Regions:
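Extreme N-terminus of proteins, especially the signal/transit-peptide cleavage junction
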Residues: 1-2, 139
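Phosphate/anion-contacting hairpin/loop surfaces
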Residues: 3-105, 110-117, 125
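Basic, nucleic-acid-binding surfaces and adjacent catalytic neighborhoods in DNA/RNA-processing proteins
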Residues: 83-207
């Protein structure tokens, strides 16, 4: 935030911001450079799904932020909120938890893994979850995201974290991207369906 407005970044799928010395050589896919007195901040995005924009009003009033759901690791994402948010949603539960208007940050990988751990089929209508399933899914999403953060995120192709290093959460993935492989719990072959245009891996026995 600046006195005259806010510079907003969306990192997309592969974007990253890093602080570096002003004389440091530019890296491939460095697109934006913010120069300060003793350092600079560079925005790097190999896949170019992210963006940067300038907004002169209160950033919380911007249309891109105003409609967002709560951050998953805050107290705002709780049982009461989650139950109410899905109560009238008959869409597949995976689509609902990936909807940023419901909760932000639960992308395809983390939604897939959370549903597997909770033994919930990704296509199950959201409003058919019982209270125990809602509570377990809520807690699992939080745990999965915390674990991913401690491991630096998930690097599948070109993702790097703020330190310029790849993440290691992919080494612990249970079902995401495992189509055709045996389930690590019951050995049944992992299957995949498409929901809202995204591949959704699941175990037909466990879920």
């Amino acid at each position: 935030r600046f006195e005259s407005g806010t510079l907003m970044f969306h990192l997309g799928m592969s974007g990253s911001l890093r602080v570096c010395k002003k004389d440091e050589e530019l890296k491939k896919h460095d697109h934006i450079e913010l120069i300060f007195n003793d350092c600079c901040v560079r925005y790097n995005d190999p896949r170019r799904f992210g963006f940067c924009l300038w907004y002169e009003g209160d950033d919380q009033d911007h249309k891109l932020l105003k409609s967002l759901g709560p951050e998953p690791l805050t107290g705002a994402f709780n049982f009461k909120y989650f139950k109410q948010a899905i109560a009238k949603r008959s869409a597949p539960i995976k689509n609902v938890i990936m909807d940023s208007k419901v909760v932000v940050g639960a992308g395809n990988i983390y939604a897939t893994e959370s549903l597997f751990i909770c033994k919930i089929h990704p296509a199950k209508p959201a409003n058919e979850l019982n209270d125990d399933q809602i509570q377990q899914l809520l807690e699992t999403i939080k745990k999965i995201l915390k674990k991913a953060i401690t491991q630096g995120g998930t690097t599948l192709k070109d993702f790097i974290n703020a330190d310029g290093k790849p993440g290691y959460f992919q080494q612990t993935l249970l079902v995401y991207g495992k189509k055709g492989e045996p389930c690590k719990v019951c050995k049944t072959q992992i299957e995949s369906i498409t929901l809202a245009g995204r591949a959704s891996s699941f175990c037909p026995s466990c879920q």
